[in-house]
Amino acid sequence: MQRTLRTFSVDKIENFKQNLLFWSQQFETIVWLDSNNYKQQYSSFDCALATDEFTSIKTDYFNAFDKLKEYQTITKDYIFGYISYDVKNDVEQLSSKNFDALDFADLFFFQPKKLIFIKGNSVEFHYLKMVDDEIEEDFEEILQFNNPTVEETNSDIKIKLRIHKDEYHSKVEKMLAHIHRGDIYE
């Protein structure tokens, strides 16, 4: 997939990074990778933003790696995403039935329309051809972006327990008994 590349130099890169992160929140799907100034010998960027989903794959663990390989072969472009722990169920003869309140897919990857890399004071925009006319406008918008102020609230947070306190203590006591017997280790 062809991308248009434009490079800009930015004086106040930390401000730009903060503006970029806030600017990205208008999109439903984003990946934000930030080294947090940790220096590595082979790093090709300090920060990367992938956003504005063009194509994606979302699947359960069954044949997840085969589906990902097919998606990657068809896309022939940058893809970003995650592989959940439960994908192991297709690789090994294992199974887990852990509670999943968030209901994430077992595997999700997407092809971004917009990619922005920061290295030092250099900012590179890698946009798909269909949106490359937005590079200059986006750059200016990010530069001028006013960070929203977050209002503090004093409302109490209510946490709903999944198990009762007594049941939790009972499970911990059983686990500690196993540790003391040497059946399992910390």
Kindly give the residue locations of the regions a language model identified.
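Signature of the chorismate-utilizing enzyme
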Residues: 1-186
